[in-house]
Amino acid sequence: MKINFFNSTLLAGLMISAVACKQASKPAQETTTKTDSAKTIVAKVADTSNTADVFNNYIGLKNQFLRSNMKGIKSTAAMLEDKLAGIKGCTETATLAHQIATSDDIKAQREAFLILNKDIIGLIKGSKFKSAPIYVDFCPMADNGKGGYWLSVNKAIENPYFPEHMKTCGQVKEQIN
């Protein structure tokens, strides 16, 4: 019953995550909007003040998945959830991190991580966050052969989806920065 509930929640999260972090994943730019009083307001899109913290916690989480370290996965996901909650538009992505932090099933955690990666990649690509090169990696075997992405700071492939059996399965698809 718990697994079915979690899978249902995960499926709902997948649908919702398509729009999660949407505001934060767009490049910062000025937009204008008209109010009822016909005044023009200039607003900044994408508050990326916590993006570096999110990225550092994300890399920590990915590294815990490489070790299949349940305790480390839970604690790092909780820290990531906290940082995501501080970014406007990332509520659903924070919920995915919460699901990872509270689950006792590593397979379910990896499924949530698969979805979370889509939002984190969008957030990093759309932000002004700069670091050493960041690589978007891809494993064609993840997600039952549909494939899955993750971020890395190393060019060498270290697959967080199959660290025990196919640690080097995958390829670099893109370099950010």
Residue ranges, per PLM feature:
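Bacterial N-terminal signal peptides that target proteins for export
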Residues: 1-10
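Short, intrinsically disordered, charge-biased short linear motifs at domain edges
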Residues: 6-7, 116, 122-129, 153-158
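C-terminal motif of bacterial Sec signal peptides marking the signal peptidase cleavage site
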Residues: 17-20
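Bacterial signal peptide processing site
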Residues: 22-25
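Post-signal peptide N-terminal segment of mature Sec-exported envelope proteins
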Residues: 30-53
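Surface-exposed, polar/charged faces of alpha-helical domains
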Residues: 49, 56, 60-82, 86-95, ...
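Small-residue-enriched alpha-helical segments and adjacent helix-cap loops
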Residues: 113-120, 139
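Amphipathic, charged alpha-helical segments and their helix-to-coil junctions
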Residues: 131-177
